[in-house]
């Protein structure tokens, strides 16, 4: 059996895997254990009571976190005409049509989010095999195919997170950095929970939010007592 590192021993001693933690206690514990030489992200895994095999029960969407994610997001926009100027004014890092598509085909992908106006999808459609596997393909369900590209750029820059369940019905997302205050992380988590509840499929039966677990990049998972989140998130 592999020998536990000192860090992992400390985590095992401090984290009770059988306990549901108060949100404030959980955040304080994660911050105490976030001792990596870089600022760790705080991630969340939400187990949903859905049947991920059924397309009408899949959950996907996007929401802007009130305190952002702590990441600098580079945004590429496929559009033209007045929309191109609006996208640049909103802070887009790359704006174009065929010229931008050519860059991507050459492997130049210095961006984190791709947004497109509907008229640009004829160009973006050629990039499905490149953007799709990377989770970058624009989609109207998450607001990245839209006539209002300027608003989409502002949302992306402000800390919008996109989410979709995996094959096990689990949503994985980030809610900030370990350097955030406990209140900022709590409010970001609550904003995500509100969005997930609004996205509940009509055909989902039984308990919808089964489990909420927080972790840092290099740390262990901590299960959250949902009753300690604000009423609007419950």
From Swiss-Prot:
Disulfide bonds: none annotated. Part of the 50S ribosomal subunit. Binds directly to 23S rRNA. The L1 stalk is quite mobile in the ribosome, and is involved in E site tRNA release. Protein L1 is also a translational repressor protein, it controls the translation of the L11 operon by binding to its mRNA. The keyword Ribosomal protein applies. Belongs to the universal ribosomal protein uL1 family. It comes from the Bacteria. Keywords: Repressor, Ribonucleoprotein, Ribosomal protein, RNA-binding, rRNA-binding, Translation regulation, tRNA-binding. PROSITE patterns: RIBOSOMAL_L1 (PS01199). This is Large ribosomal subunit protein uL1. One of its GO terms (molecular function) is tRNA binding. InterPro entries: Ribosom_uL1_bac-type, Ribosomal_uL1, Ribosomal_uL1-like, Ribosomal_uL1/biogenesis, Ribosomal_uL1_3-a/b-sand, Ribosomal_uL1_CS. One of its GO terms (biological process) is translation. One of its GO terms (cellular component) is cytosolic large ribosomal subunit.
